[in-house]
């Protein structure tokens, strides 16, 4: 069953650091069967007060997603992400 990592980007406090993170993260995804479904897509708020930028990653299953997140390659980048942006990430399984 497909699994998704959903990230909400609430703010970027180091644009250069975040740009470096973004330029390097895709390679870490491919090694674990992951891909971007939503990244910087155009949005239209239908209801409520939506502020964060949304990113959605797709993996073949939750094991692949966890292996990506826990991988040395991604964990090496995650510190850069935490230093350069305010984000939340969740893992959710599809139907």
Model-predicted segments: where are they?
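Short S/T/G/P-rich N-terminal loop/turn motif that feeds into the first structured element of a domain
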Residues: 1-53, 60-70, 93-95
